[in-house]
């Protein structure tokens, strides 16, 4: 079986979905920009060697419809001989893209893949044109399609208090801002054209979504948004709404050696798993256990963790269930989706890229990226430095 390595991982800055810096920039343009920059950063790669572009996107309609992977690759001027496919595993879409590329490389069905994902939640909101079959309620709880209510239930089941959520939400913003000040985002963020408040064209170099003034005390004043009477989940402890894209260059170790490219990590294990849609945020737990078993590792072997912060209640429930509460100094060291936002199709390769950069910065060997997925799934990837 061929060894799979990641040579590069980049992303756009995260823009606010409401009147943000990318309000006049289309999802295809964000994606195409990263595709071009991956090639600029890796001149030893002949674009003709890319087997396929695999791009995650959840709301595949309007500008994100009709196979955005292909549209963006054509917009980027990539060779027309390269394939392009858009995949949808809801929140895990771009991590699914990584898994599909990895599986192809392992089995000899291609040597080089360009993967990533995008979501412009300002242009195509999450609930745009959602139409669940009412018969679904025969098999799942009525509120399973309301992500915030599933987080409320998960938090109650695992004893995650309002105070714990507020502290975690503030931590996300503080750590993301600290990462900005220390330059820890510099190797993954690619400056991207956007527009300032006046509408003038501007080069966006930093995340727009982080709120450095956020404290647990300020979050404690917010009202619950999903269960106004008995709830604990607020806008401040939910992932922000943002627009962005991410990308990775994935190839076989043999191809990287042939091209003289330096692999940053290899894929050690990967998995998906299902869970009850009513507690969809629990998905990372079975997915992580499955990925670790396939990698021949235990949770004790993981040196750095990236849990996607869909909600503080959700992320903390997974931390508690995996028994790593005593490892908070190894978890989401640059903050997460509460501060940066969760552009659905973008997030899987975004958190993976952040983890890879942190693994290098902290000089550790084994890392885990995992995320929950709407309607009851989880996805996880174990990375090892090479």
Curated annotation (Swiss-Prot):
It catalyses: an acyl-CoA + acetyl-CoA = a 3-oxoacyl-CoA + CoA. The keyword Hydrolase does not apply. GO terms for cellular component: cytoplasm. It is found in: Cytoplasm. The keyword Transferase applies. Keywords: Acyltransferase, Cytoplasm, Fatty acid metabolism, Lipid degradation, Lipid metabolism, Transferase. Signal peptide: none annotated. Pathway: Lipid metabolism; fatty acid beta-oxidation. GO terms for biological process: fatty acid beta-oxidation; phenylacetate catabolic process. GO terms for molecular function: acetyl-CoA C-acyltransferase activity. PROSITE patterns: THIOLASE_1 (PS00098), THIOLASE_2 (PS00737), THIOLASE_3 (PS00099). Belongs to the thiolase-like superfamily. Thiolase family. Catalyzes the final step of fatty acid oxidation in which acetyl-CoA is released and the CoA ester of a fatty acid two carbons shorter is formed. HAMAP family: FadA. Heterotetramer of two alpha chains (FadB) and two beta chains (FadA). PANTHER family: 3-KETOACYL-COA THIOLASE FADA, 3-KETOACYL-COA THIOLASE, PEROXISOMAL. This is 3-ketoacyl-CoA thiolase. It comes from Colwellia psychrerythraea (strain 34H / ATCC BAA-681) (Vibrio psychroerythus). The gene is fadA.
């Amino acid at each position: 079986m061929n060894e799979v390595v990641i040579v590069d991982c980049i992303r756009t800055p995260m823009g606010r979905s409401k009147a943000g810096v990318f309000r006049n920039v289309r999802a295809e343009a964000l994606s195409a920009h990263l595709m071009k920059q991956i090639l600029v950063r890796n001149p030893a790669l002949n674009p003709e060697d890319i087997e396929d572009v695999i791009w995650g996107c959840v709301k595949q309609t309007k500008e994100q419809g009709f196979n955005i992977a292909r549209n963006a690759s054509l917009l980027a001027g990539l060779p027309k001989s390269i394939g392009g496919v858009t995949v949808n595993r809801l929140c895990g879409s771009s991590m699914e893209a990584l898994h599909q590329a990895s599986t192809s490389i392992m089995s000899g069905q291609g040597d080089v893949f360009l993967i990533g994902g995008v979501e412009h939640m300002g242009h195509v909101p999450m609930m745009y044109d959602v139409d669940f079959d009412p018969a679904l309620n025969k098999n799942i709880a009525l509120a399973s399609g309301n992500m915030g209510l599933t987080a409320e239930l998960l938090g109650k089941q695992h004893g995650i208090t309002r105070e714990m959520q507020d502290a975690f939400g503030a931590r996300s913003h503080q750590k993301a801002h600290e990462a900005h000040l220390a330059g820890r985002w510099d190797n993954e963020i690619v400056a991207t054209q956007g527009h300032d408040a006046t509408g003038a064209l501007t080069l966006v170099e930093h995340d727009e979504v982080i709120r450095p003034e956020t404290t647990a005390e300020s979050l404690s004043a917010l009202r619950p948004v999903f269960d106004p009477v008995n709830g604990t989940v607020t806008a401040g402890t939910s992932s922000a709404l943002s627009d962005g894209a991410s990308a990775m260059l994935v190839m076989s170790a043999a191809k990287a050696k042939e091209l003289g490219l330096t692999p940053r990590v290899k894929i050690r294990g990967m998995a998906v798993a299902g869970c009850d849609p009513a507690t969809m945020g629990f998905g990372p737990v079975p997915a992580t256990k499955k990925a670790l078993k396939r990698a021949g590792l235990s949770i004790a072997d993981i040196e750095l963790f990236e849990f996607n912060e869909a909600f503080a209640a959700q992320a903390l429930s997974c931390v508690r269930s995996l028994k790593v509460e005593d490892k908070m100094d190894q978890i989401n060291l640059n903050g997460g989706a509460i501060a940066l936002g969760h552009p659905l199709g973008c997030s899987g390769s975004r958190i993976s890229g952040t983890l890879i950069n942190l693994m290098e910065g902290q000089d550790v060997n084994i890392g885990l990226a995992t995320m929950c997925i709407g309607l009851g799934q989880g996805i996880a990837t174990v990375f090892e430095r090479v």
